[in-house]
């Protein structure tokens, strides 16, 4: 059974879905993410309560990494990229090309970008820390300008530029 809750954050309401094994999805507050969620509202589920607490700590500037159980599905390549994302230090950024190099696929920056864009648990798996080779903010939770604004906010937050 899937459970969900909505968590108010400085970047908008995050909708979080969990199975009994872990977090399956975090939806960003963007218009193109308004698809109904096949899960029962259950903010008291232990995994969702833990997610709420850890996300609150993150947005208050008190947490730099998450230790939530995850229950995500993806290809082997996607899972490798998502696993490498958590190794990007808090407050740091890395280019898609650098990330491709680290997952053993030099020259696969576009494929890394595709995997990054399919990350089902943004913030917890920090895909916002990946930027273009030129330093440009490109793509975040979809192509909309709203996603780029959230990415910019998260990077600024982690560099000490803003807190909740």
Regions found by a protein language model. Give the residues of each.
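Basic nucleic-acid-binding alpha-helical/helix-turn surface characteristic of O6-alkylguanine DNA
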Residues: 1-107, 157-164
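…primarily DNA-binding HTH/wHTH and HhH modules…
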Residues: 133-164
